[in-house]
Amino acid sequence: MATPVTAQCSSKTWELSLYELHRTPQAIMDGTEIAVSPRSLHSELMCPICLDMLKNTMTTKECLHRFCSDCIVTALRSGNKECPTCRKKLVSKRSLRPDPNFDALISKIYPSRDEYEAHQDRVLAKLSRLHNQQALSSSIEEGLKMQAMHRAQRVRKHQHESDNTTFSGGEDNCDSRSHVSNPSVHSNQEAGPSRKRSRASEDSGAEPDLSHEGGVRSPDPPGGGENGSEIELVFRAHPLLVEKDGYSQTRYVKTTANATVDHLSKYLALRIALEEEALRGGAEGVTVGEVSEKQYTIYICTGAAGGQYTTLNGSLTLELVNEKYWKISKPLELYYAPTKEQK
């Protein structure tokens, strides 16, 4: 059995047997042609500096490594007086010699050099464009995720601050709640008219306050301060009962959980009436007596495919609606349409 012999090369170590060391290649006696892919020769025709095909090939006299003329001259001018491949000493350009035979070989393999370079430029431009689009889409997705995360943090912070404000400034509500166990009736009598006055001012058509998310906050129902929990709503026009050119605006509302469907219906009627008056230029005033909770009917989507809508009873609270129909941690989506008698 032949024992392996180690042949040392400048860059690689080959394990060759005695047969491989001493054998002679078989000569081709007929006209057989061996096809070799140009890609397999790319490493032999590539400049180690620019990693592109050799142009105006220059060979080092000491170590016989090949480089592009511009690449090796630039490397020597930069101060590294050595071969970029093997680090042999190169004093100056006198250590280099042109290699026209290798240039002729490349021109034989690639007769249309300009066409090859143009094709390569097109491939690189296409890759760059695709990568830029992918980077842009991924950047947009990351930006949307960060915005959603920061928005959720702002919502929690705003709710926490509003709860603290309610607890610190809600002495009137505390007095009104303590009338059952506290014999002091004087504080309850003082808190009662103030609540009635605030309710009357809200029913008189005052502009609702803007919430932190750009929506509107509906008027609190009587006794709204007794329940600290709040529910966020998304009001949309009924897709089947409302014309597209009608009330197509999506409304975002935040109110207490013990508000009823009738409260929302009356608030919606008042809000739409005020908007219509503003569009008409304020020619006709809107009074509280003209607004009724019977003008609009509130629906909720209960079908899995989104095509089935259930009418909500006016006495139901939003908390019961959320527990019975919604049961997911996202704003409650409700739909409204004019009542058939009112329409």
Curated annotation (Swiss-Prot):
User: Which Enzyme Commission number(s) are on file for it?
Assistant: 2.3.2.27
Provide the catalytic activity annotation: S-ubiquitinyl-[E2 ubiquitin-conjugating enzyme]-L-cysteine + [acceptor protein]-L-lysine = [E2 ubiquitin-conjugating enzyme]-L-cysteine + N(6)-ubiquitinyl-[acceptor protein]-L-lysine
Query: What do the Gene Ontology cellular component annotations say?
Result: chromosome; cytoplasm; MLL1 complex; nucleus; PcG protein complex; PRC1 complex; ubiquitin ligase complex
In this chain, the stretch annotated as Interaction with HIP2 covers: 2-180
Q: What InterPro entries would the database entry show?
A: RAWUL, RING1/RING2, Znf_RING, Znf_RING/FYVE/PHD, Znf_RING_CS
Ranges for the region named Interaction with nucleosomes via an acidic patch on histone H2A and histone H2B are 89-94
Report RING-type zinc finger ranges.
47-87
State one molecular function term (GO): zinc ion binding
Give the residue ranges for region: Disordered: 147-229
Compositionally biased region (Polar residues):
179-191
Swiss-Prot/TrEMBL GO biological process terms: epigenetic regulation of gene expression; negative regulation of DNA-templated transcription; negative regulation of transcription by RNA polymerase II; protein ubiquitination
Q: How does it assemble?
A: Component of chromatin-associated Polycomb (PcG) complexes. Component of a PRC1-like complex. Component of some MLL1/MLL complex.
What is this protein called in UniProt? E3 ubiquitin-protein ligase RING2-B
Which organism does this record belong to? Answer: Xenopus laevis
State the encoding gene.
rnf2-b
